[in-house]
């Protein structure tokens, strides 16, 4: 599934995992965005405890709920992607380029599993999975494998392929959002399903994979076998729910960062009532924000987590706040201090 930033891809993935879990079926939502996973796990664990306490008070259950029990329940269907990957790297060996279980390993390690429990695995921001070279480097440096022959997409698909009955892999993909070293993009997922052992899989993809931000517009051409290929336009989310009144904003930002000057200029002309200014002066940016913030409005500054050169102007992008406390603490708690939340001196960063 593809979609513009803020269109609701993550929401669809989460809702699918939660609905499947509630129905007694096994599904897991996986994300490489650690703060997101931590906040979600904590929020759902608190909700679980609150609901179970209500059931206990009403006499519907005799079991007192615990936070530990709630966390275990939630982690069954919302996990960090790298922890899921590492779990299925346990107890395997590479034989002639193929993954095989180590003889006797899973008999002596009953807390481990070779075959995933879940039938549905949902990978959010799937374009950020690692290339073969990056995963090989990482596993070699950590002493796990000397020469691992799989990319992260190929390995994750191979995990679900171990199922004897059925399995579904859902990839939520943002176009052109491979932002860190070694991130594979949609190309690596396609190369994975091109492997002969996966030719029995049905592949459902968005028709927007032919757009330029997905493997340079050649994603559909990269697929070798079209016998089980199903192209569905409904697998693309085209409207941003974050800014539904300004759908062109995401388009403008994409064009600006891609240095598409003519296209960006045309799009900006449509956004006449949307406040967009461009400057290289931090002081001017702060001044503009203060002048245009009205009433109870709050302003802030967003900085890239990789922009360490900003340290020269006292912007510490390495700062790691307590995400759970920031997002989930009740606003009426006395210990929460929001006095500085309207002063553009602290910086958020997006990983």
Please place each PLM-identified region on the residue numbering:
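Hydrophobic anchor at the beta1->P-loop junction of P-loop NTPases
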Residues: 1
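Walker A (P-loop) phosphate-binding loop of P-loop NTPases
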Residues: 6
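Conserved lysine of the Walker
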Residues: 9
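Hydrophobic positions on the alpha1 helix immediately C-terminal to the Walker A/P-loop
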Residues: 12, 16
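Conserved Walker A/P-loop ATP-binding site and its immediately adjacent core
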Residues: 25-45
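Core RecA-like ATPase module of SF1/SF2 helicases and allied nucleic-acid translocases
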Residues: 48-49, 56-60, 68, 194-351
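Conserved RecA-like ASCE ATPase "motif II neighborhood" in helicase/translocase motors
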Residues: 68-160, 348-350
């Amino acid at each position: 599934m593809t979609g513009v930033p803020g269109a609701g891809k993550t929401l669809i993935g989460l809702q699918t995992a939660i609905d499947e879990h509630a129905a007694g079926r096994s599904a897991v939502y996986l994300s490489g965005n650690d703060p997101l996973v931590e906040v979600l796990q904590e929020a759902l664990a608190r909700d679980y405890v609150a609901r179970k306490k209500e059931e206990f008070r009403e006499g519907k259950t005799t079991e007192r709920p615990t936070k530990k029990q709630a966390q275990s329940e939630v982690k069954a269907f919302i996990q960090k992607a790298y922890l899921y990957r590492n779990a299925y790297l346990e107890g395997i060996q590479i034989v002639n380029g193929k993954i095989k279980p180590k003889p006797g390993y899973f008999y002596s390690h009953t807390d481990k599993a070779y075959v995933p429990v879940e039938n549905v695995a949902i990978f959010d921001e799937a374009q950020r999975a690692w290339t073969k070279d990056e995963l090989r480097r990482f596993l070699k440096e950590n002493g796990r494998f000397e020469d691992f022959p799989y990319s992260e997409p190929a390995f994750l698909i191979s995990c679900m392929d171990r199922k004897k009955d059925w399995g579904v892999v859902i990839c939520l993909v943002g176009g052109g959002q491979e932002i860190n070293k070694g991130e594979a993009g949609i190309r690596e997922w396609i190369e994975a399903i091109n492997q002969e052992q996966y030719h029995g899989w049905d592949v459902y993809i968005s028709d927007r994979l032919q757009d330029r931000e997905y493997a340079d517009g050649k994603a559909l051409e990269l697929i070798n076998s079209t016998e089980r290929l199903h192209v569905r336009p409904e697998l693309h989310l085209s409207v941003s729910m974050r800014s539904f009144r300004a759908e062109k904003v995401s388009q403008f930002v994409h064009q600006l960062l891609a240095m598409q000057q003519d296209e960006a200029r045309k799009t900006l002309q449509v956004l006449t009532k949307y406040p967009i200014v461009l400057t290289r002066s931090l002081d001017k940016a702060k001044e503009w924000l203060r002048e245009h913030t009205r009433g109870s409005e709050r302003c802030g500054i967003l900085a890239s987590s990789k922009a360490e050169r900003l340290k020269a102007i006292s912007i510490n992008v390495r700062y790691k706040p307590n995400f759970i406390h920031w997002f989930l603490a009740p606003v009426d708690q006395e210990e929460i201090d929001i006095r500085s939340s309207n002063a553009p001196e602290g910086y958020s960063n997006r990983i």
